[in-house]
Amino acid sequence: MNIHEYQGKEILRGFGVTVPKGIVAFSAEEAKKAAETLLTEQGGGVVVVKAQIHAGGRGKAGGVKLVRSADEAFEVATQMIGTTLVTHQTGPEGKEVRRLLVEEGMNIEKELYLGITLDRATSCNVLMVSTEGGMEIEKVAEETPEKLLKIQIHPTLGLQPNQAREAAFFLGLEGEQFKNAVKFISALYNAYMKADCSLAEINPLVVTKEGRVIALDAKINFDDNALFRHKDYIDLRDTSEEDPLEVEASKSNLNYVRLDGNVGCMVNGAGLAMGTMDMIQLAGGKPANFLDVGGGANPQTVQEGFRIILTDPNVKAILVNIFGGIVRCDRVAGGVIEAAKNIDIHVPVIVRLEGTNADIAQKMLDESGLNLVSAKGLSDAAKKVNEALAAA
C-alpha cells in the first residue's frame, strides 16, 4: 500500500526520524494559513508548497514551488489544486492534485539518497546510500554505480551500528553531520521494520548548513500482507490515487493490475499469471492485465473477474488459464459458464483448465452450448488467443 509524502513523514517522525515541519492543506485558503504559520515560526524566509500525489518527479512537473509569503502560497495553491500533474511515473494521463503539503524551507548544503527495501535476490533487506540525491536511483545504479553503496542487512541481526557508520562515511559526512546521519539511518531502519514497510526511501536526504540531517522527501510503502498488524495505517489509503478497476477488484479479493495490452488474463497464482503473460507476449499478443483469482476461486469471483476485465475497452480476447491444485477446475468452469450467461461477453474466450477435476470441467464447458474455445496446454492457449485476435 502506498501513502502520501506527508503521511509517511508523520509516521517517520514518530520513530525519531528528522523531518521538516509541515502542514497538509486541502484548499488554497488552508495553504495560505499554513504558510503564514510556518513563516511566522521561522521568522520569514521561504516555505515550500508540494503537490501530494502517489508519484515521483513532481518538481520537474511543476508540483513543487518555493514561496515567500502567505499570499504567494495562496496563488500557487490555487494553480495546483484541481490540476492534473503529469510526471515520468504517472503515465500520460497524470494524476489530479487534491491536497498539498506546505513545509518549512531548508538551508541546503548537500542532497543525498537513502533507501531501505527488500533485495529479493539475496532474501535480505538492503540499505542503499548515494551521494547523488534528488536523482532517480535506478539511473544512478545504471550510469554511475560507483556512487551507490548497497549494504546487506542480516535478517536476524538487523542493521548493525558499524553498517550505519559505513553508510555515513560513504556519503562523505564528518563531525556533527556524521553523528546525525548515523542516528538518522538507525531511526529509519527501526521505522522500516516496525511499520512493516516494503520500501522506505528518502530522496533527497539533505544536510543543512547548520548540520541537520533531514528527510526533504519521503516515500513509504507498506507490505499489504502485514497491514492486519497496523489497523491505523489502513485509513491512510487514498483510493483516488489508484486505478478504479484495481480498487474494485480488491473488494472481491482479486489481485488485478491494469496494463496496456489487448488480451485479458484470468489466472490462479501469481507465478502462473506471469508465465501466462509471457506466453501471450511471445505469441505476438499483449496482456491487458494481471489478474490472480487466488486459491479460493469460486463462481462468484470468476464472474467478478470477467466483469472487471471487460470494463477495459482495449480487451479484444480473454484467456482463462487455471491449474487446479487448491482450486477445483469444475468450480472455475461453473463461474465461466455463469459469467457467459449473465454478462455480455462480446470477445472470444479461450479456456485452459488442468489439474483437479479438469475432466469434469471440460465436460461442463463442452455441454454448456456456449462459444468457448478450449485449449490443451499453455502454448496452445496462447496460439488460439492470437488466432482469435487475428480473426477479430
Curated annotation (Swiss-Prot):
E.C. numbers: 6.2.1.5
Broad EC category: ligase
Pfam family, one: Ligase_CoA
Binding site for Mg(2+): 203, 217
Gene Ontology MF: a single term: succinate-CoA ligase (GDP-forming) activity
Cofactor, how bound (note): Binds 1 Mg(2+) ion per subunit.
Keyword field: ATP-binding, Ligase, Magnesium, Metal-binding, Nucleotide-binding, Tricarboxylic acid cycle
Any GO BP annotation: tricarboxylic acid cycle
Positions bound to ATP: 50, 57-59, 103, 106, 111
Cofactors named for this entry: Mg(2+)
Family in the record: Belongs to the succinate/malate CoA ligase beta subunit family.
Role description: Succinyl-CoA synthetase functions in the citric acid cycle (TCA), coupling the hydrolysis of succinyl-CoA to the synthesis of either ATP or GTP and thus represents the only step of substrate-level phosphorylation in the TCA. The beta subunit provides nucleotide specificity of the enzyme and binds the substrate succinate, while the binding sites for coenzyme A and phosphate are found in the alpha subunit.
Subunit comment: Heterotetramer of two alpha and two beta subunits.
Protein name, as recorded: Succinate--CoA ligase [ADP-forming] subunit beta
Lineage, broadest ranks: Bacteria, Pseudomonadati, Chlorobiota, Chlorobiia, Chlorobiales
Gene name of this polypeptide: sucC
